[in-house]
Design a protein with these regions (language model features):
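Short intrinsically disordered terminal tails
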Residues: 1, 122-123
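Short, flexible coil/linker elements and helix-boundary hinge sites characteristic
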Residues: 23-26, 67-68, 75, 120
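Extended, charge-biased low-complexity segments
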Residues: 1-50
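Amphipathic protein-protein interaction modules
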Residues: 47-114
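Eukaryote-specific, cytoplasm-facing alpha-helical/coiled-coil scaffolding segments in long proteins
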Residues: 113-121
Length: 123
């Protein structure tokens, strides 16, 4: 086991995010619920932080990137996105932070480029 030089931020979707998701054109979410999204939220590695305040500083400095990643995961068209600002971000997501991240496997971590989910491939 190794301690990493990263902290982690988990963004737990809330009701306003779910309402937006359901309002998207051609979205088919019959097999998905808000609880499903909350049970398996996206997690983002950020620079290592000594405390929660430092982690929040990192989150705020990367707010556009984090919020855009969450939105693009479901809708690639920014025309359907809300304004990206801290107020909407904190309404749409509960933020959970872990300042210490340990890497248990004894092998190199792999990285792959982000690819958004295609909700309706036939649309």
């Amino acid at each position: 086991m190794h301690e990493t030089n990263r902290s982690v931020v988990m963004l737990i979707p809330q009701e306003p995010f779910w309402a937006w998701l359901n309002s998207l054109p051609d979205s088919d979410l019959d097999d998905l619920s808000l609880e499903d999204l909350q049970d398996d939220p996206n997690a983002y590695l950020i620079d290592a932080c000594d405390d929660i305040d430092q982690a929040w500083d990192e989150i705020i400095s990367r707010l556009d990137e984090l919020f855009s990643a969450e939105l693009a995961d479901w809708c690639e068209d920014p025309e359907h996105w809300p304004d990206i600002n801290p107020e909407i971000f904190t309404e749409w997501f509960e933020v959970r932070i872990a300042t210490v991240v340990a890497d248990l496997p004894n092998k190199e971590m792999q990285r792959t480029p982000f690819e958004p989910i295609i909700l309706n491939p036939d649309a």
